[in-house]
Amino acid sequence: MREPAFSFRLHLFAAMILLVDVFSALSITTQTFRNVQRHSTDRQLRARDSQAKNYVIRDEERMPLRKLPYDLNLSLSSPPVATLRTALELLYPQAGPSQLWHFEFVTQMKRELSVMQSHPKKLIFDQLIGAMRSMNRNMHMKWNHASDISELSPYTQLILPIALKLRQRLSEGASNDADWMSLLMRLIPYGFLRKEVELLLRTAGYDNVQNYIALYDQMLSKVSAEDTLKFQLLDSNIAPNFQELNKEFLYRSVSLLASKTDGVTADSIVQTTCWSFILIQLTKAKYPQDELQKILEDSMPAEKVVAVMKSYKEGFPNPAHR
């Protein structure tokens, strides 16, 4: 009787050892599987982080460039208005002060204006002057009736090649809302005013001007002052021939900010996000104090001018600490 008992205990002990080995193996296998999963996940995260860092390093803390179609020779389907806000939300928050596609857009338009043949240039210039006179008579707007292209403001000069493109599309019967919305994606953040957008449409020969102006108003209402200011060309590396345009754009930006922050007191105006942003850019660009003061005086009350200039002269906000 003792021998079976001893044998039974021996077999039981062996079975227990076997079970321990099995559970140990299962535990090791499970841990290995988890480690593999964790390693795979970490590797993916590192890859994404590496990509993000690359974008930060190469693109100055902005997302990869998303170019919208501007080629007016393309046939585009008209996008639903419901997608407008989505398109704006995707595009504008990802853009930084050094976003270059608007710079490229202006460069392209200025280049096309310089090489434009004399006959179409004269034709579109006459259309522009005619549209100016029509708007002045019908809308009581003050326009300088220039006799030469060089006398036009930088923004008005850009209207000529753009209007010529749109006019060609109209003559082909191919112009549609998609062309216009795509173009507005560039005109609005670059600071084109409502009257200039209307002038562009009239110069191009559009009949239903108000319908297209309505799209401009709708898009503009969805763009905040901060988003618009992100497209400034306030950069120390700006090309010298863009200085005049840059100054004009700054004037428009300050006017926009003044209207957006009309209810903010003079004591706290420089602490707002949008004013803080523009002062950072101005400080980086070492913008002349006297020129900034003139622009401010045309856009806001005296007490706010004093507050902004005081902060700017003191070097606030200092870009080195941002």
UniProtKB/Swiss-Prot annotation:
Highest taxon above the source species: Eukaryota
Glycosylation sites: N73
Inducing or repressing factors: Expression is up-regulated during plant colonization, 3 days after infection.
Short motif (RxLR-dEER): ranges: 43-62
Residue ranges that the Swiss-Prot or TrEMBL entry lists as coiled coil: none
Record's keyword annotation contains Transmembrane helix: no
Name of this chain's protein: Secreted RxLR effector protein RXLR-C17
UniProt source species: Plasmopara halstedii (Downy mildew of sunflower)
